[in-house]
Design a protein with these regions (language model features):
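N-terminal export leaders
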Residues: 12-27
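C-terminal regulatory/interaction regions
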Residues: 281-322
Length: 322
């Protein structure tokens, strides 16, 4: 990937950049991204989950903390805007607890923006290798119309794993076991879940959303089929009592994941059917391919459709759709 890489394709073939140029889709990205990060404007709040687990909201993305006498685990570090407040809150809750391990569920700044504050020198930062790669390079995200610069090296994950590694992987913190694994090409190409088996809690990062359409970051490897597969994988790890922590917002249950899976599979089928007729995103939007889901999933369905098509084209339809 070059430093100034731009992911531009023929708009006559796909009809996507015409929509972007008109501003209809690109203007919506800021609204959806603001909604996804709306928690930055909230006060930090702590909700007890189970067995020493706490959910911290208002820091950007959801943050989960496990505190034990032997050590601590933190999943995600929120946004940079709230990093100092979050670090202070975590320190207050941990007290004199030994050094902790930090997990990053993916690279997005509302989940990794506080890494430097959350992870003093020497703290293990666990993530998929693709997350480290995105955090250490410069790249352009077309749907945001934004360049991302490399993060400071202190923020990079320093304990990464690959898709080929045996999974799930695990660490032990005192008597508590923490399991984690890769969710390939879903929200991004570096998504992971973090599972606390004893508490029956899964932290799903950006692969699960609460009451809004998922963000399909196709520039960094996400696509709708991969997200559907990731959702199925998470469902297989759940029972009726499992708590699933989404990227932002309220805790989800297995039934919520099943609804997300059904929505993703239905929308994918409709996108493929229209694309294989040689038609594009504007036709998909005009036909209202998400209309029965709009009441459940807030946000701009136009952006969701556009990003779903982009990711599907790059992952599966390129070379098939002329």
């Amino acid at each position: 990937m070059t430093a100034e890489a731009e992911f531009i394709v023929d708009d006559d073939r796909r009809g996507v950049l015409k929509a972007l140029a008109s501003g209809a889709v690109l203007a919506a990205t800021s609204d959806v991204w603001r909604a996804a990060r709306a928690a930055d404007d909230d006060s930090l709040a702590v909700e007890a989950l189970r067995g020493g687990l706490s959910l911290i909201t208002g820091a950007g993305g959801n943050v989960v903390l496990l505190a034990t006498p032997e050590g601590a685990v933190q999943v995600d570090s929120g946004s940079s805007a709230r990093s100092n407040d979050l670090a202070k809150l975590v320190a207050e809750r941990l007290g004199s607890s030994p050094a902790r391990t930090l997990f990053n569920t993916h690279w997005h700044l509302d989940h990794t923006g506080g890494n430097e504050a959350a992870a003093p020198s020497g703290t293990p930062i666990v993530a998929h290798e693709n997350t480290r790669l995105w955090m250490s390079t410069k790249f352009y995200v077309e749907w945001e119309d934004r360049y991302y610069r490399p993060r400071p090296k202190a923020a990079w994950p320093n304990k990464t794993f690959f898709s080929s590694d045996p999974q799930p992987l695990s660490i032990d913190v005192g008597k508590a076991r923490v399991e984690y694994g890769h969710l390939p090409e879903a929200h991004t190409d570096g998504d992971i879940y973090v599972r606390f088996p004893e508490q029956n809690v899964i932290v799903a990062g950006g692969t699960v959303t609460a009451g809004r359409y998922p963000v399909l970051d196709y520039i960094t490897g996400g696509w709708i089929g991969g997200l559907a597969d990731a959702t199925k994988k998470l469902i297989a790890l759940c029972d009726a009592e499992t708590l699933v922590v989404p990227d932002v917002g309220r805790v989800q249950k297995r039934a919520d994941l099943e609804a997300q899976r059904d929505m993703l599979e239905t929308v994918r089928q409709r996108i493929e059917a229209i694309a294989l007729q040689g038609r594009g995103v504007q036709d998909m939007i005009a036909e209202g391919i998400t209309k029965e889901f709009d009441a459940r999933y807030a946000g701009d369905s136009k952006l969701f459709i556009s990003n779903a098509y982009e990711g599907l084209w790059w992952s599966r339809l390129r070379g098939i759709v002329a």
